[in-house]
Structures are given as structure tokens and as C-alpha cells.
Amino acid sequence: AYWFHGTRTSADNTFDSGLLPLNQTESLVMDMLVNLAPDVVVKERLQAWNFHAGVPDTLFRTRTRNEMHWGPYGHLVQEVHFHARKLWQHDYLRLPELVEDVCNAYQKKYGQDLTEHYLKVLKPCIVCFRADIEYEKGAFEAALSYAYTSVRELPPDSGAVFGIDRHGISVCLDEIVNVEFTKLHELDG
């Protein structure tokens, strides 16, 4: 099956190393945020956090230390990413969780919200990859739900939400079908 991993990243990210689980992306995410920091002060402060579990945020530490959160993850229905909030999903095209955690920690510690800056410099991206379906009935139900709403020109409903968890195993470069930077985001507000 084809799966769709949503993120927001630097425009030059080619995913040459594949899609990595969170425990392997921690330093890459921090390097990206440091390199794209709005000024020297922010850059130095973020650099000081750039070591394993160095971000002073409980969620960041949980996500990078606990393999239950590592993923990588993907949705079976690509359009779910464009209606994430309506479907009670995290909006990865807006900000990935680790980036959000860093912004939250920075605001708490230094009183400056970096969210708008990183929304401007990072670009929404969907990585399509191939992987086996582990639960065929769930995938079939999601596909039927999506077909039902799609032919009626409606956005997907919660029945179309079905995903894959790679359980800490990377998506290799040869499993990646396409990397698409998109301007489409949150079609339903």
C-alpha cells in the first residue's frame, strides 16, 4: 500500500536517509531549527539544547525516549492530512510534534514564541512511501469510508483515518515513492 507521512521541514530536505523514527531525528530536527533560527541569540539557546533529550519539555523527552512514539507514521488516505484538525488528528503539515515541543519549551523558558517564525521558514511536505498493510480489515474500511465521501465531493470523515506505525523502523529511501512540498493545507479551516 501507499502511505502518506505529513511533516513540515526545510525546503531543501530530500529525505536522502529515508523517513527516520523520532529517536533518530531528534538531532536532525534540532540542527534544522538551529540553522533556521531567527537570530543569533535564539540560535545559541537552541544549540545549548542540542543533545539527547536536552530540550526542557516533558513531551519532547517522552517522544524521543519512549519507543511507543517513534513511528514513523503515515495515513492511508492522503487527504486526511488536509483536514487533520476536523478529524481530531495532530496537524503535522502545520508543525511536527518535536518542533512544536521545542517552540513551547522556548516560550516557557524565554518568553518568546518561535512558532510563527518556523511556520514561515518550514514548508509543508507529504512523503509517500510503500509498506505492507498489517490490518487489512481496517484499511479496507478506511478506503470505503473515503470512497463514500469522495464521490459525494465531501471531505474525509473519521472513518477514513487509518494509519501505519513502523515501530521504530526507518522507511528506506527505496520505499519512498514521492516527496511533495504542498501549498494545500487545512482546506476546511
Regions found by a protein language model. Give the residues of each.
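Low-complexity, serine/threonine/proline-enriched polar segments
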Residues: 23-72, 76-85
